[in-house]
């Protein structure tokens, strides 16, 4: 059975997640190397799918897959509902079980029952990310937001 390069990229990433459950994400090279070891495949399309074609937040060019999440520069993990998605991406999130060898179908089951139900990575809401975001807010708007927060803190809960 010939496996689509997008499915190879997803399967290699899923295998890494299962083999390293404490790892949040993996380098592009780690995923490519895992795909090569598993599938003995050197098709350049696998690399392109890891880098761009399967990344949900990227503009589709041409693929619309939502199989991977770009968690940081040069890092990927499997996509989870709630991750950022480019509005033009409507493609598949995981391989069709009938299109992959039987020995990998349990990875799709694991993804659906466990992985996809976990919340998106906490790294996206880390203090450093929030501080970087706050740094983008104009000072005037930041003062208004701070005042609104202070006003809300003075609300008497007995009034509700």
Feature names for model-found ranges:
Residues 121-152:
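Short interaction-prone segments
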Residues 2-9, 28, 126-130:
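Onset of an N-terminal alpha helix
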Residues 1-19, 41-121, 155, 159:
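Phospho-regulated, low-complexity intrinsically disordered regions of nuclear gene-regulatory
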Residues 30-32:
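A short acidic, leucine-rich amphipathic alpha-helix
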Residues 21-22, 40-44, 139-142:
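Alpha-helix boundary/capping and short turn/kink residues
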Residues 34, 38:
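Residues within the alpha-helical elements of helix-turn-helix
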Residues 26-27, 45-46, 125, 144:
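Alpha-helix N-cap and coil->helix boundary residues
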Residues 17-27:
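Short capping segments at the starts of secondary-structure elements
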